[in-house]
């Protein structure tokens, strides 16, 4: 099983997503498995790809989990990328890396990669966009830094990408702004006409400090 594999290899594992029957409804979920083989959580896709996923029920909770001594991760699935509030909810809960497993071979992969970069910039975090390659999908997985730069990118074939990330950089970018300028999370928090979500999940945003010009 995936849990046995994660324990054997001493890795945290998210083996993509699959359909899952829960509480009388069919959902699309991605399991998060720790390096001890424990099932940490099941992330439910919020936005089914309608009308193609007709009959699939979307989830109503954002998925954030902490890997001890590493950092805070957010997870959303495939079509969730197309809805900015999905990634914003993850960032507001402190996600420093957002993981995005998908399986698509559609002609809009170019646009998805644009949105992935925009998401990294808007949420000031690392964004790991993983798409199935080979016979199942068109691949082109991409890893993006918290200022929108492409760190590494796969081809259309099945491929393994390895990268080391500095999560302290997320903290610096969120504190000082992208290139020392835009501070969207703090601006979102301090807006006098906030969205409802700003009131619901304000605790993490308050840890970012005052919205001010960074000192040299």
Where does each model-flagged region fall?
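Glycine-rich, aromatic-flanked loop segments that form ligand/cofactor-binding clefts
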Residues: 10, 18-21
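CN hydrolase (nitrilase-like) catalytic-core segments centered on the catalytic cysteine
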Residues: 1-14, 81-161
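A structural signal for short, well-ordered beta-strand segments and their strand-loop junctions
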Residues: 14-15, 41
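C-terminal beta-strand edge segments of enzyme domains
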Residues: 64, 126, 132-216
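Eukaryotic scaffold repeat domains enriched in small/polar residues
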Residues: 8, 59, 93, 213-216
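Active-site catalytic loop in hydrolytic enzyme cores
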Residues: 4, 20-96, 106-114, 118, ...
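Generic secondary-structure signature for well-ordered alpha-helical cores
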Residues: 7, 35-38, 45, 121, ...
